[in-house]
Regions:
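Single conserved hydrophobic/aromatic residue that forms the stacking wall/gate
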Residues: 1-12
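Glycine-rich phosphate-binding loops that contact phosphosugars or nucleotide phosphates
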Residues: 3, 168-310, 314-317, 397-443, ...
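Conserved catalytic micro-motifs used in adenylation/nucleotidyl-transfer and phosphoryl/amide-
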Residues: 26-73, 78-83, 88-90
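Active-site phosphate/pyrophosphate-binding segments
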Residues: 26-29, 138-142, 146-174, 264-393, ...
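Conserved phosphate/anionic-ligand binding catalytic regions in large, soluble enzymes, centered on
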Residues: 45-59, 128-131, 142, 179-188, ...
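Catalytic P-loop NTP-binding/switch module of NTPases
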Residues: 98-168
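Generic C-terminus detector
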Residues: 105, 420, 435, 445-486
Length: 486
């Protein structure tokens, strides 16, 4: 027995005393779960070995230097030349060079990619925080995203790889995402269903991937993720592909896992987003969803030329209208100073406004640590209204003209129970001032695109509340920019 044990130990010892690549390959096939590893061997100075499975990893190279990171922004100020390491692959980094290997230890070739982002985009450029800078960048990046597929009044998804024929054949749309991207999906659902005859389901990726549901034939799964590395969203994408469902990724990071694995990709052009709480990436995802909905309607013959042209004109006004909102941010800063010490907050709205309220609520809780909940306004009477007491702050988003009076009636209900009301609506709806204690107006725009404007005051409000409380706006506690764990 002793001899056998020693023999086994010697066998393992010899196996792991091969090259570092051999040693790592033998170890990796025995590891379960997801990982991104960087390993150094004392007998191989000046070398770093890297491997990943289901977790993001990129490698940057410039001159005599090599960099290993989980995301592009981390190395952007050093280099824009990157390699993407695949699942269950190894990399050996030396000064200014990198080699890749498969699990058989064979060297494989990879193409170096150049990131087009400007390195200055990863700097604060005079702003106090990245979040404030990124809020102010929204007009430009939204315009860039629109112009990437919209030219001379026509939308072309040639770069996305989704043809009009593909759109005609789609019978069901699933939108799968997490966090703020899920709120984008909720807005997209309303817009797609209003413009087309398609049925749309919006699912949380962390729930979708575990459900035993039958996915419809000729369906499209839209996976929304800023980083393109969100673990649950990536798992949901793989599930859809296993079931034969066509997949489309809406992502911001070129070459990310979702971008590589999805059948089609719509890249948002938000540039690097450093602040953990998303603002400009969210807004670019919104306009990407609008453009998809518009082209679905046109390709399927479900929208008139006049209505399509009207929407094209309206979507092109979003950047300049956001500029106007940003010019009046001092009023929001003043209001934020009045609510900086509240313990609870509630957001209400109907339809698209409810989806915006969910995003506003998430922003407030993310960076100011105030307990905040969003409710569909019509659900208040089914329980949440019992939480309203004297002084409770309720934020009401009221931009949908067909739902205006209904939501105003809900505001009256909570005010009669002592709530302090923040009203957010479009210019012209001045009756809001008869109900709300503080009112913010946004420029008028087609109801379908209202979320792009109404979310901006809520972003600013959350920012100023967090600053007023003295918190680290860009790096809120317990949160990460790219959620790569399940």
């Amino acid at each position: 027995m002793t001899s056998s044990l020693v023999g086994s130990e010697m066998c393992i010892r010899d196996r792991y005393l091969g090259t570092p690549v051999d040693a790592l390959n033998h170890a990796l096939v025995r590891i379960r779960g997801s990982y991104a590893l960087a390993v150094m061997f004392k007998d191989y100075p000046g070398e770093i070995y890297a491997a990943r499975k289901d977790s993001p990893m990129i490698i940057g190279v410039t001159g005599g230097e090599s960099y290993l990171a989980s995301d592009v922004p981390a190395i952007l100020k050093y280099t824009r030349n990157v390699y993407y390491i695949g699942n269950m692959e190894l990399a050996r980094l030396t000064k200014g060079a990198v080699a890749f290997y498969n699990l058989d230890g064979e060297e494989i070739q990879k193409e170096m990619k150049t990131i087009e982002w400007d390195a200055e985009a990863a700097e604060k450029s005079g702003y106090e925080h990245f979040m404030l800078k990124e809020i102010h960048e929204q007009p430009k990046v939204i315009k860039d995203t629109i112009n990437s597929v919209l030219t001379d009044g026509n939308i072309s998804f040639e770069s996305v790889g989704l043809s009009d024929e593909d759109m005609k054949n789609i019978q069901q749309v699933y939108i799968v995402a997490c966090g703020s991207a899920y709120h984008v999906g909720m807005v997209a659902q309303y817009v797609i269903e209003e413009l087309t005859s398609l049925s749309v389901r919006v699912e949380l990726a962390s729930e979708f991937r575990y459900r035993q549901m039958k996915l419809a034939k000729n369906s499209l799964a839209i996976i929304i993720s800023q980083s393109g590395e969100t673990a649950d969203s990536l798992a949901a994408l793989r599930l859809c592909k296993e079931k034969g469902v066509k997949t489309l990724g809406i992502v911001n990071v070129v070459g990310s896992s979702i971008a590589r694995e999805a059948d089609n990709v719509f890249y948002t052009l938000a540039g690097p987003e450093i602040s953990v709480a998303t603002t400009k990436a969210y807004s670019c995802q919104l306009v990407a969803a609008y453009l998809l909905a518009m082209q679905f309607a046109k390709a399927r013959g479900e929208i008139s030329d006049e209505r399509f042209a009207q929407l094209v004109e309206e979507i092109n006004t979003i950047p300049e209208k956001i500029e106007k909102i940003l010019e009046d941010k001092e009023r929001l800063q003043w209001f934020a100073s009045k609510v900086v010490n509240i313990k609870d907050a509630f957001f209400i709205g109907r339809g698209i406004d409810y989806a915006v309220g969910m995003e506003g609520s998430l922003k407030l809780k993310e960076i100011s640590y105030i307990h905040s909940e969003a409710y569909a306004a019509g659900e208040l009477k089914h329980g949440p209204i019992s939480l309203i007491e004297d002084g409770t702050v309720v934020f009401s988003v009221v931009t949908q003209s067909a739902l205006y009076e209904k939501t105003i009636s809900n505001m009256v209900e909570v005010k009669s129970r002592g709530a302090k009301l923040f009203g957010l609506t479009a210019y012209g709806n001045y009756a809001m001032e008869d109900v709300a204690d503080f009112t913010v107006y946004t420029p008028r725009i087609d109801n379908l695109f209202a979320a792009s404007l109404s979310v901006v005051p809520l972003q600013l409000l959350s920012y100023y509340v967090s600053v007023g409380k003295g918190y680290d706006v860009d790096k809120p506690r317990n949160l990460a920019k790219s959620v790569t764990v399940e």
